[in-house]
């Protein structure tokens, strides 16, 4: 745990801010590519004449491709310059997204999503490794908060823009827009990403010792379990919020979109604040406070009365998004600091893989618990909330076991 009194100056200088914004821009396009699939579902169902089960296969194919790629990538990602790895993966991601833009059959779209998932799933791990390598511990919270702001920006700016493009020009153009947006980001990455050579000795490509090294250490397993519990503590509820608010609370689709727009704006601001507080008061302490505070909106949102006014319900969802997403910032800073630089890329690739698995488990768990009534509403959302509380308490316990080494 950090000693706050001994922390040096934590001010982010200009070139560091530019790097944070560049990494956040890469994440923005990556997250937008994933998130835009949900509101575009109706377009796919109609054009390809598929049912919801086949559409869920498109979604899960991305997640599982990302998980497998991240796990395999853990074997060799630390053998390459961080900049070279980031550029290669981002090019592959843009190619996969471009394939989505020209997809005209269901099978081709499935192939395109798998391609995007393979590269997109590894980008996050490399970006987080760059933060861990470039920023010292006392600045890592701010840097992580800035990059995490990409999720909020994707919710507020990316997804609504993608929907409008789909409405006016067609869903293919939404993916084309992401590619066009990503090209200048790619150029900036080539020009300005710092060169971070591998700290490892040359090894055979087929050598799996790095993956074994990551998974064989107890401290690594504790850190991985810690972050999986953090993700499960949010995603068990997040995956069902929209349908619950629409079916049970009577929200219109426009009002449902307000959940993400308002919540995204607030989390964009709060992510920087949480990062600052994490650096000033310590990651463990801020994480503890945020988890305890987050339990309140988790229980509130899963127990909302049907006659609650819309503005009050939106207030609950906004507080939920701010606090639940806020937990991730200090937890991610703790995670990157629990790994030595020479294996950080491999570890973060494994973590990205398990993060994809955790999001899938959270969705499956919520789906198994919820019961749809004949009138279309859902029951047992409260039980989903109790599971989320349990995962958060587990994360709180495991956070005390995470050892800071770098």
Language-model segments: residues:
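Juxtamembrane intracellular "pre-TM" segments in multi-pass secondary transporters
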Residues: 4-13, 194-224
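Extracytoplasmic gate region of multi-pass secondary transporters
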Residues: 37-38, 220-264
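Helix-breaking motifs and short loop linkers at transmembrane-helix boundaries and internal kinks
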Residues: 49, 81, 102-108, 250, ...
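Conserved MFS/SLC helix-loop-helix module at the cytosolic interface between two early adjacent transmembrane helices
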Residues: 68-107
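Cytoplasmic helix-loop-helix junction between adjacent transmembrane helices
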Residues: 112-153
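Helix-loop-helix hairpin linking two adjacent transmembrane segments in secondary transporters
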Residues: 137, 146-193
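A membrane-interface helix-boundary motif in multi-pass transporters
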Residues: 167-179, 370-390
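C-terminal transmembrane helical hairpin of 12-TM major facilitator-type secondary transporters
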Residues: 284-331
């Amino acid at each position: 745990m950090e000693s706050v009194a001994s922390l040096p100056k934590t001010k982010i200088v200009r070139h560091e801010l530019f790097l944070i914004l560049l990494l956040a821009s890469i994440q923005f396009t990556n997250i937008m590519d994933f998130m835009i699939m949900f509101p575009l579902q109706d377009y796919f169902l109609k054009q390809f004449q598929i049912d919801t089960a086949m559409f869920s296969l498109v979604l899960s194919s991305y997640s599982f491709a990302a998980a497998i790629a991240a796990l395999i990538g853990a074997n060799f990602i630390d053998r390459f310059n961080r900049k070279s790895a980031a550029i290669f993966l981002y090019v592959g991601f843009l190619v996969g997204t471009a394939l989505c833009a020209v997809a005209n059959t269901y099978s081709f779209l499935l192939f395109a999503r798998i391609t995007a998932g393979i590269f997109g799933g590894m980008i996050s791990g490399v970006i987080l490794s760059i933060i861990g390598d470039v920023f010292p511990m006392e600045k890592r919270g701010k840097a992580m908060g800035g990059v995490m702001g990409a999720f909020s920006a994707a919710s507020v700016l990316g997804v609504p823009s993608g929907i409008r493009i789909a409405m006016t020009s067609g869903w293919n153009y939404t993916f084309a827009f992401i590619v066009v947006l990503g090209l200048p980001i790619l150029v900036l990455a080539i020009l300005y990403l710092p060169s971070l050579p591998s700290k490892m000795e040359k090894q055979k490509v087929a050598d799996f010792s790095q993956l074994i090294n990551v998974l064989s250490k107890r401290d690594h397993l504790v850190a991985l379990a810690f972050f999986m519990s953090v993700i499960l503590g949010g995603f068990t509820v997040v995956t069902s919020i929209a349908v619950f608010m629409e079916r049970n609370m009577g929200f219109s689709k426009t009002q449902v979109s307000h959940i993400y727009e308002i919540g995204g704006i607030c989390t964009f601001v709060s992510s920087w604040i949480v990062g600052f507080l994490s650096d000033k008061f310590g990651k463990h302490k801020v994480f503890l406070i945020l988890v305890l505070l987050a339990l309140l909106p988790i229980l509130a949102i899963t127990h909302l009365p049907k006659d609650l006014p819309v503005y009050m319900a939106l207030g609950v969802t906004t507080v939920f998004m701010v606090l639940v997403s806020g937990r991730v910032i200090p937890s991610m800073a703790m995670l990157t600091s629990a790994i030595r630089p020479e294996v950080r890329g491999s570890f973060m690739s494994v973590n990205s893989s398990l993060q994809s698995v955790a999001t899938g488990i959270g969705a499956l768990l919520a789906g198994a618990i919820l019961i749809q009534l004949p009138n279309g509403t859902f029951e047992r959302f409260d039980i989903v909330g109790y599971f989320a509380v349990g995962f958060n308490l587990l994360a709180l316990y495991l956070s005390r076991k995470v050892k800071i080494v770098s």
